[in-house]
Amino acid sequence: MNSSNLENLNYKSSIRDEVVPSRKRLTLPPWLEVAKPRLIPLLLATTLGGMALTEEWPLSSPKLICTLGGGALAAAAAGALNCLWEMELDKRMTRTSKRALPAGKLSSQTVFLAAVSCTLAASMLLVSGVNYLAAGLTLLGLFSYVILYTVILKPRTTKNIVFGGVAGAIPPLVGASAATGHVGLSGWWLFGLVMLWTPAHFWALAILLKDDYASVGIPMLPSVKGSVFTAKAISRYGWATVLMSIMGVFALPEGGLLYGIMLLPFNGRLLQLINELKKSPDDLSRAKSLFRWSILYMFGICLLLLISRTQLSVEFEQQSMQIFLSIVSLLSN
């Protein structure tokens, strides 16, 4: 290997380490690592977003705690079952070989029992403290992640995250059903937004890890089609995400105007990063920037939904309407 190739390899490795810092900078206890706790906050954020889209927001504290607690337990169970299924795969990848299960820090039996316990606890919490629909949707999300995505789609098709993304899109439905006992059109809007956002978000990471996936035969889009093709696909899904996000103006029971205004910089930055990656698809630093911003983007959307349901938003809309009517009156005279 010549010096230029070695430098390029080291550069790629350093970028990957920066994007997935947990492997280098933060060591979790084995029992916590298998639960994949870094994925849980965003799932809970979109659950809150689903709640905020209903007339019943805000929920009572007991129902809110039961919904989020049940969701966190189910997500932990899904993460553990995913680790169990992919244990042999993780052993073959340098990046994942030191994880708790492939490294022998935990036994398969222990992890399986923990996953079952978390699933049962989540079900009991949601059934007793929320409702059957929220419990059923939560279990559907768990099943979708473990069976549909991990077992069926991930090892077989480059469209794995397109269809497998349904697992990550279910929490908004859980939130809406927890609040009202049914999903409603607004809940389905946020479900659709997460579905469109997921491929662009995940493929940005997959560009950085395409060599890792290729080494074990996982057909992630960048590994099979290359970075140029993937960047174009990211652009399509990114634009679809932006257009869908604007529909939140109409999905909100109130506060849509403030949401729409605050949304502009989020969408602008997302499109900017997507365009930069499209210009230089093999630039790992650009893929890293897009991946990181896409996480902040979805957190931001959920935060905007919550802000839009506050008294501040109501007052803003009232004042805006008064200003608008005053302008119309002046123009008509």
Curated annotation (Swiss-Prot):
| InterPro entries in UniProt | Protohaem_IX_farnesylTrfase, UbiA_prenyltransferase, UbiA_prenylTrfase_CS, UbiA_sf
One GO term (biological process): heme O biosynthetic process
Report the pathway entry: Porphyrin-containing compound metabolism; heme O biosynthesis; heme O from protoheme: step 1/1
Q: Where in the cell is it found?
A: Cell inner membrane
HAMAP family xref list: CyoE_CtaB
Q: What does this protein do?
A: Converts heme B (protoheme IX) to heme O by substitution of the vinyl group on carbon 2 of heme B porphyrin ring with a hydroxyethyl farnesyl side group.
Identify this protein by name: Protoheme IX farnesyltransferase
* Source organism (scientific name): Prochlorococcus marinus (strain MIT 9301)
Taxonomic lineage is: Bacteria, Bacillati, Cyanobacteriota, Cyanophyceae, Synechococcales
